[in-house]
Amino acid sequence: MTLLAKSLEELTDWVKDQGQPAYRGKQLHQWLYEKGVHSLADISVFPQEWRSKMADYPIGRSLIHYRSVAPDRTRKYLLKLADGLIIEAVGIPSEKRLTVCVSSQVGCPMACDFCATGKGGFTRNLKAHEIVDQVLTVQEDFQQRVSHVVFMGMGEPLLNIPEVVTAIHCLNKDVGIGQRCLTISTVGLPHKIKQLAEHNLQITFAVSLHASNQQVRAKLIPSADHYLLSNLIQDCQEYVQITGRRVTFEYILLAGVNDLPEHARELAKLVKGFQSHVNLIPYNPIQEVDYQRPDEKRIKAFKTILEQEKVAVTVRYSRGLATDAACGQLRSSVMVQ
């Protein structure tokens, strides 16, 4: 088995199976999650003979294939997995926190019209250790503890719930990040929101809405053809009832597509009446598509309408624009080179 993303109990059972005393499990746990070891051969508290014997045993760490740094100190990583596939992770520093944006899949099958990742197709789900590794890699590179993790990188997390939930538990219990500092973002899939809710996680849950009516959403998100907006909102209301946690709606503003005053009023009607918050995200243009970012006047007007309708709303801007750091962009640009 791969050791990363395993609990203290699982690691203790493993060392005992290898003929080692149980206390080695606690040592292994510490070296994996606190010291960030990449090889069992580097665990100095282990007997030299066993270290040499187990030197090639898979821990589950990946290699940094490419790294770029933006003027705002955002760092974008391409990580090479054990099978040679490439995924993205982003480290986003601010004054009092370090946030990591992680991928949950290699590529993405959702094929959203405005997304660079979707243009590259889908290969496979990530394993839990490949998700946790992204966080540890960024933490080591910054030499600073990660405070927040957002599942907003490559892939649709709700198509990989077992591995994502395992990673969530590991990041919480083993890496030491509070569940409320962990965010899962989804475009929404039938039955999957309730399935996630039943895990009773105290995470932040975000839905990539991006449209205020069915017609526009189906154009932007092909899967919306099979999942009506009205049903998505009902599932979000049920999520709030089950978990007691609010839903955050992510809304990318696309000039002339979903940023008109009538869209703002439609959006307000959708999200009022239950615990929710709207994040407005001005679009980060990519070469593959023709969508554009609205001007600041249009962004402010959209936000003002929501505020007048008593909707909790925040405008959030993408970090790392100078280094293709919005989701999917760096991988697509580097793979073309």
Curated annotation (Swiss-Prot):
For the ligand ([4Fe-4S] cluster), the binding residues are 108, 112, 115
Q: What class of enzyme is it?
A: transferase
Cysteines engaged in disulfide bonds, as pairs: 101-327
- Give the record's cofactor note, including how many are bound: Binds 1 [4Fe-4S] cluster. The cluster is coordinated with 3 cysteines and an exchangeable S-adenosyl-L-methionine.
Q: Which reaction does it catalyse?
A: adenosine(2503) in 23S rRNA + 2 reduced [2Fe-2S]-[ferredoxin] + 2 S-adenosyl-L-methionine = 2-methyladenosine(2503) in 23S rRNA + 5'-deoxyadenosine + L-methionine + 2 oxidized [2Fe-2S]-[ferredoxin] + S-adenosyl-L-homocysteine; adenosine(37) in tRNA + 2 reduced [2Fe-2S]-[ferredoxin] + 2 S-adenosyl-L-methionine = 2-methyladenosine(37) in tRNA + 5'-deoxyadenosine + L-methionine + 2 oxidized [2Fe-2S]-[ferredoxin] + S-adenosyl-L-homocysteine
GO biological process terms on file: rRNA base methylation; tRNA methylation
Q: What InterPro entries does the entry give? A: Aldolase_TIM, Methyltransferase_A, RlmN_N, RNA_MTrfase_RlmN, rRNA_lsu_MTrfase_RlmN/Cfr, rSAM
- Which keywords describe this protein according to UniProt? 4Fe-4S, Cytoplasm, Disulfide bond, Iron, Iron-sulfur, Metal-binding, Methyltransferase, rRNA processing, S-adenosyl-L-methionine, Transferase, tRNA processing
Q: A Gene Ontology CC term for this entry?
A: cytoplasm
Residue span(s) of domain Radical SAM core: 94-324
Instruction: Give the EC number(s) listed in the UniProt record.
Output: 2.1.1.192
Specify which residues bind S-adenosyl-L-methionine according to the UniProt entry for this protein.
155-156, 185, 208-210, 284
The record, for SUPFAM superfamilies, names:
Radical SAM enzymes
- Localization of this protein: Cytoplasm
What this protein needs as a cofactor is: [4Fe-4S] cluster
Query: Catalytic residues?
Result: 88 (proton acceptor), 327 (s-methylcysteine intermediate)
> Would the keyword Cytoplasm turn up in this protein's UniProt record?
yes
| GO MF annotations, alphabetized | 4 iron, 4 sulfur cluster binding; metal ion binding; rRNA (adenine(2503)-C2-)-methyltransferase activity; rRNA binding; tRNA (adenine(37)-C2)-methyltransferase activity; tRNA binding
The family line of this record is: Belongs to the radical SAM superfamily. RlmN family.
| Functional note | Specifically methylates position 2 of adenine 2503 in 23S rRNA and position 2 of adenine 37 in tRNAs.
Another remark in the UniProt entry says: Reaction proceeds by a ping-pong mechanism involving intermediate methylation of a conserved cysteine residue.
Q: Which PANTHER family match?
A: 23S RRNA METHYLTRANSFERASE (PTHR30544), RADICAL SAM CORE DOMAIN-CONTAINING PROTEIN (PTHR30544:SF5)
Q: What is this protein called?
A: Probable dual-specificity RNA methyltransferase RlmN
Q: Which organism is it from?
A: Microcystis aeruginosa (strain NIES-843 / IAM M-2473)
